[in-house]
Every structure is written in structure tokens, then in C-alpha cells.
């Protein structure tokens, strides 16, 4: 427990503010995301095709806007002011969904606001990285603990979202999300620092100009995209699979997701502690190997107890990838924390787009069980690519 004491000694008001903002913004996001399809179906009256189109347009718009803002944030301006602007957009987006039920308005104005709002989280992590670097603090552990706040938010957020939406209505739920974003904005404005741009030494000039030109960055992006494709295919398909083919209760899906999210927290923190000893590549290879075991296990072990037990491998997979994966991008792109963090989050968005298409096609043609064979194969490819990225 020495590392916990060390972290406690190094914690100060600014660090605590980073943690609280990450948690609050995570809860606000976790209130909206799990219930979006239900909202579009019941409140807006959208058919399945239009619901899927909404997700696709939202993801594509998010990638474009976040890359544009990331490039600007790394080269000019105050990153903290950009986060405040994104929070304002998040408030507007939540209020739009609270009081509007027109599909065309939501897929245009709503998607635009959401794509701007979703940039807040990668920019928050980029600001945290720059602050930790400038204050000579432990970057990896701090980032891991901060990322764990998002997992904690996702333990709390989805059950709370369904409780609010089903008992009090979507207007109340989205209004509460807007209120949480407002509190986050106040904390960001008064507690988080503005970090001055650091002039990079000349030997890092190529890294500043490059990024995507680096084959290691490209390979890590593809590997990360495949990892999140696997995770999203599982999240989309699992609730349908356990009820329609395994004959297990619907509520088990919630328990499985909650168990995995809870176990991710210690996995993230332990990964942050051990990464200096073993290196980022080895930790990521261990994580993706755990993912391969998880998805392969789903093919052969389908009982309720087996599914719960397998969540340990799922937690190791997502917990390490979500924390160390982002830091690996940042270390491969020195001086471009915003672009690197956004590239990581865009690998998640790209994975979501691919997962929706692949899962839908496979499940429609060959059934839910075939989905997990495809996921297992994709995870093996991700493991191979991860092992080929250089360690930094």
C-alpha cells in the first residue's frame, strides 16, 4: 500500500479537482449514453434504421470535430477555455434532448452540440497530462486514478439513468445531466489551471510535425480500434444473446456490465503502479491477451456463474487498455497531448462504427453465437498488432 500513501501525499487541490471533474462529467455522460436508443425509440418514435443512423452520424461528426479542435488546442489558445466551451455545448445538448422530440433537429443541432461536447473529456485528460508534466508529478498513476473515476461513474450512471428515465421521464434525466455539466463547468473555471505551452527541443520537431506519419502511431490506432470494436460488439450483442439464446434473465446484462465496471477500477490503478516496472507495451499485451481469453471463454462457457467469472478478464482488458492505451498514444506523440488523446478517443468512436455494422450483419445472418467467434478472431489480430508497436 506504499503507492497509495505516495499518491495521497502528492494529491493537492488541483489534482482533486481533476478527479472530481472527471467523475462528474463521466456521470453526466453515463446518464445520457445508455438510454439514448430508448429515448429515440419511445420519445422520438424513431424506427431501428433511423436509430442506427443517428449513432453513425454522431460518431462520424464526433471524430471530425474532435480532430479539428485537438489540432488547434495543441498549437494555440488556452486548453482550459476550450474545455469550458465544450461544457457549455454539453449543457446545451442535454437541454435540447430534454425539451425537443424532433428527429431532424436532434440529428443536426443535437449531433453538432454533442460532437463539440464530447471533446471535453479528451481535452481534460490532455490538460491533466500537461499539468502533471509541468509539476513533475507521477503522470501514469495520476492518469490511471483519474481514468478510474470514469469507470466509477459508469458503475453509478447507467442504473441511475434508467431509474430516472423510467420513473420520472427523460426530461428530468437530461435536465439533471445538464445540471451536473453546469457544476463541472464551475469547477473547471475556478479550480483547474491554465498550462503554458512548453517549447519543445529541436530533436522533437519531427514528432510535433508527424504523429499519424509515424507507423507506430498508425499501428496502435488500428490495434486500439479493433480492441474497442470487440468491446462494443460485446456490449451491443450481449443483452440480446443472454435473453434470446441462453435463456438467462434480462437483468443479468446489467449485473455483468456493473461487475466489469467495478473490477476495472483496481485494474486501472494497479496498471498505473506496475507500468514503470513492465513497460506500456507489455502491460497492453497482457491486457489484450486477457481480452482474447474473455471472448474465447464466452464461446465455451455460458452459465450465469461462468459469465460473471469471465468479467475478471474483461475488467483487466478494458481497465488497462483505457488507461495505459491513452498514455501510450501520448508518449508516441510528445508535445501533442491533445491530438494524441483525441486519436485514442477516436479509435473508440471508429470501433463503435465498425462494431454496429459487423455485429448487426453477423447476428442477422448467422445468429448471436457467431458474433463471439468473430470477436475472438478480431481480438487475436489486435493482440498481434499491439505486440508490434514500439515501447516508449
Swiss-Prot record:
Segments on the Periplasmic side according to the record's topology features: 32-48, 103-106, 171, 241-251, 304-308, 364-365
Membrane-spanning residues: 11-31, 49-69, 82-102, 107-127, 150-170, 172-192, 220-240, 252-272, 283-303, 309-329, 343-363, 366-386
Alphabetized GO MF terms: carbohydrate:proton symporter activity
Gene3D superfamilies in UniProt: MFS general substrate transporter like domains
Gene Ontology process terms (BP): carbohydrate transmembrane transport; cellular response to glucose-phosphate stress; D-glucose transmembrane transport; lactose transport
Keyword presence, Transport: yes
Function: Involved in the efflux of sugars. The physiological role may be the detoxification of non-metabolizable sugar analogs. Can transport IPTG, lactose and glucose. Has broad substrate specificity, with preferences for glucosides or galactosides with alkyl or aryl substituents.
Protein name: Sugar efflux transporter A
Organism from which the protein derives: Escherichia coli (strain K12)
Upper lineage: Bacteria, Pseudomonadati, Pseudomonadota, Gammaproteobacteria, Enterobacterales
Gene for this chain: setA
